[in-house]
Each structure stands twice: as structure tokens, then as C-alpha cells.
Amino acid sequence: MADFLGMMKQAAQLQSKMKAMQAELDQIEVEGSSGGGLVQVRMSAKMEVRGVSIDPSLLKPDEGGVLEDLLVAAHADAHRKAEAAMQEKMQALTGGLGLPPGLGLG
């Protein structure tokens, strides 16, 4: 019975730490870029896009296809960085628990 109570206490502590981590992830902002910085996407570590910056040279009618490609690439770059930041926070939180990877706790 004591083991069960200990596990319940650990679960409650983990839940509290998860809430705090979610707040931290919301404060972390990463930036992805493409085209040598012509397009930049800012994103939180919770994968929420916070802003997009586009160099004026790309805002020409004949640059539409290039701009689309650069936006996709910049978003992908920001997403990778946000995912890495989230994984780092998750590792710090769950590192000693021996949980299997890929549980989607973030």
C-alpha cells in the first residue's frame, strides 16, 4: 500500500512539474530561417507561430513560388528548433523516471 501511495505522490508531482514546464515552453521562442535569412519564422517551443518576417525583395509578383518555398523551409526550420527545445525540457523533467521515448507528454 505504501508503494501505491508513493507512486500517487510521484504522479501528482510530475503533473505539477508538467504544468510548470508547459508555461516555460510558452516563454521559449525559436527562430527558423531560409534563403539566407530572407524569410524568418518565430515560433514558441509549444509549436505556436509567433511571427513571420519576409524581406521586401521577395514581395514581387514573379517571386510567389520562391516565397512559398522559403516560407515552408523557414517554418520547418523553426519547427525543428522548437521540437528540440521541447525535447530538452522533457528530458530534464522525465530523465530519472525511466519512461519510454515517444509518449507525447509535451
From Swiss-Prot:
A GO term, aspect molecular function: DNA binding
Annotated keywords: Cytoplasm, DNA-binding
Give the primary localization class: cytoplasm
GO cellular component entries: bacterial nucleoid; cytosol
Q: Which Pfam families match?
A: YbaB_DNA_bd (PF02575)
Which domain of life, per UniProt?
Answer: Bacteria
Q: Does the keyword Disulfide bond apply?
A: no
Regarding protein family, the annotation reads: Belongs to the YbaB/EbfC family.
Name of this protein: Nucleoid-associated protein RPD_0086
State the organism named in the record: Rhodopseudomonas palustris (strain BisB5)
